[in-house]
Amino acid sequence: VHVEVEGLEAERWYFYRFHTGSEVSPVGRTRTTPERHVMPERLKFAFTSCQHWESGFFNGYPHMQQDDHDLVVHLGDYIYEYAGIDNRVRKHLGPEITSLDDYRLRYSQYRTDIGLQEMHRVAPWLVTWDDHEFDNNYANLVSEEDGISPETFLARRINAYQAYYEFMPLRRRSLPLGPDMKLYRACHFGRLAKFHVLDTRQYRTDQPNGDHQKPMEGKVFDQNATMLGTKQEYWLMRHLNASHSTWNVLAQQVMMAPLNRGTPEKPLYSMDQWPGYEVSRRRLLKYMHERRVPNPVVLTGDIHLNWVNDLQLDFQDPDSPIVGTELVGTAMSSGGNGGRGRNGIDGSAQAGFTGTSGLGIEV
């Protein structure tokens, strides 16, 4: 059900419920944003990502509910497409999902989690996707798997996008048109904050230097490689340039700062993240620096670890200007979460984060 209600007052809580036949839904709660010229006293929001059903229960949501947020931002990997595996905390229904019915069933299964249900009930959500809502590490119309025909992959993308729209709180303007779905958009909270919600999957070129972890060399510097696509990048720059908000928040998926997963002598970086699209990353950071965009903050999910990063104009120069801040949040349940996956990367950070608590990030 997608309801777009008009005529509501700004900056207030509303309660609602649905009737169909003899059935009545639980009472939901949502909040309207302040008018654009108003400076609200505060905005309290949470962001999350990466909730793998089989890896654990979604226990972060009850903590969010206790903190009474104005907004929840989900940065992607709301579901995972993989087949069910035995001897996990709980098991996906069926094989790897490909059909529209498969995707619908997977969303329905995830929505049986009580914590997730309740968080949707008590606060508005601002959502975007990453890769697992469709297929791991895909880029536009390119599968990470060999031997998948373009026709088969396109049909699967149509199914994945349709199911995502059906289950997410999205307006009619995001209604899919076949394999295409416009998800990038802006959301204003008065003059305090402007959210620029991005899509780093649908329009990106294929990973220019291949997938996985590799040095920053060769095709990483491809001038034609793009993370956002030409149209979305132009839209983002136009909105950043026109913004008069105190904070400009980029809600997106993959880590923007470089994370060395190798050694100091032989550094390796994820080619699926922004370092794999170095020209695209530099162009965006340079634009924000030259136009003096007010207080850029990048929200990131994807890698199941907490990081706080300075976004420098040139990451190879320690004295390079700092353009903004990146906040990388750990997973809701997916593997890692500051555990065994940390061993190889602690040395690349000035500060390591050990986990999360109901009060925030533990340093």
For every predicted segment, state its role:
Residues 1-363:
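Metal-dependent phosphoester/phosphodiester hydrolase catalytic core
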